[in-house]
Swiss-Prot record:
GO terms for biological process: fructose 1,6-bisphosphate metabolic process; fructose 6-phosphate metabolic process; fructose metabolic process; gluconeogenesis; reductive pentose-phosphate cycle; sucrose biosynthetic process. Its cofactor is Mg(2+). Pfam families: FBPase (PF00316), FBPase_C (PF18913). Mg(2+) 1 binds at residues 92, 113, 115. This is Fructose-1,6-bisphosphatase class 1. It is an enzyme of class 3 (hydrolase). The lineage of its organism: Bacteria, Pseudomonadati, Chlorobiota, Chlorobiia, Chlorobiales.
Length: 333
């Protein structure tokens, strides 16, 4: 980071790939980066203020809402919505779409998970924000609707995530490579730290919640048994790395190589992760870094969303490792 490239400067340089955007993309991503700074400020001091624990309510997913979840959601909506650059938004925490007060001038839709892995915040484990940006289908922002949010993943114009951990890292793509930035609190800026991230074609790590083993189908069980067997010729056994925070598990595997698997279970036959808030943005990033992302059979970015909170299985990471998991899921092995 000796040349100190800020995220704002980097986004401006990326703007050349979008001559028709007239600077809008720069403003959109800067808005997201600003909102991330606000969330980061509270995450790092969460144990010092009354922001840990549950609110006593549940969100649209049926999950208990944590105070920091609610705070992050409100901050992102207010910080981003006030500038009028997004005509419509969707959050994992809100049942329906969100229409910002100044939406008449916005030409984009924002979908986001305000605080992924928030169940870990009480024990100081990394959490994160995931976001996805789409261009509106129509020309009138005042008529933005749910259909503008229910676009294929391949129609994203930008996607990214922010990890709040020992350091704060923001990773994003606009379809021209994947770039990571580390927050420097002394100057209040995200500085380029990981340029043109390329994920290894194969890795030695797998991330899955094996506590749900009894609920997995036979293909998933055979896959897990296979990757634990000793066979130096195929680099087995794999090592497990599972934090329970999707964005943190994904980020590690993106850099080191490996696969994250959240298969269907008897409890969640259609999968548990959200297509629009989690799978699509991470799949866009993963493919841009040379990886692969599917639901075990179909490419994530090709799935036609039917509802805002649609769920999906997810197999994402290094190409060879994802294909291996798919072969067991499909009964090829």
């Amino acid at each position: 980071m000796s040349n100190l490239i800020t995220i704002e400067r980097h986004i401006l340089e990326q703007q050349k790939f979008f001559p028709d955007a007239q600077g809008e993309l720069t403003d959109l991503l800067n808005d997201v980066a600003f909102a991330a700074k606000l969330v980061r400020r509270e995450v790092v001091r969460a144990g010092l203020v009354d922001i840990l624990g549950f609110t006593g309510s549940t969100n649209v997913q049926g999950e208990e809402v944590k105070k920091l979840d609610l705070f992050a959601n409100e901050k992102i909506i207010s910080a981003i919505g006030q500038h009028g650059r997004f005509a419509i938004m969707g959050s994992e925490e809100n049942e329906g779409v969100i229409i910002p007060p100044k939406n008449e001038s916005g030409n984009y839709a924002l979908l986001f998970d305000p605080l992924d892995g928030s169940s870990n915040i009480d024990v100081n484990v990394s959490v994160g924000t995931i976001f996805s940006i789409y261009k509106l289908k129509g020309d009138d922002p005042g008529k933005a609707s749910l259909s503008d949010c229910l676009q294929h993943g391949y129609e994203q114009v930008a996607a990214g995530y922010v990890i709040y951990g020992s350091s704060v890292v923001m990773v994003y793509t606009t379809g021209h490579g994947v770039h990571g930035f580390t927050y420097d609190p002394t100057i209040g800026e995200f500085l380029l730290s990981h340029e043109n991230i390329i994920t290894p074609k194969s890795g030695k790590y797998y991330s899955i919640n094996e506590g749900s083993y009894a609920q997995f189908n036979e293909g998933t069980k055979r896959y897990l048994d296979y990757i634990k067997e000793e066979d130096p010729a195929t680099n087995r056994p794999y090592s497990t790395r599972y934090i329970g925070s999707l964005v943190a598990d994904f980020h590690r595997n993106l850099l080191t190589g490996g696969v994250f698997v959240y298969p269907p279970t008897t409890k969640h036959l259609k999968g548990k992760l959200r297509l629009m808030y989690e799978a699509n943005p991470l799949a866009f990033i993963c493919e841009q870094a040379g990886g692969r992302a599917t639901n075990g059979r179909d490419r994530i970015l090709d799935i036609q969303p039917l509802e805002l909170h649609q769920r999906t299985p997810l197999y994402i990471g290094s190409v060879d490792d994802v294909i291996l998991a798919e072969e067991f899921e499909q009964g090829i092995r």
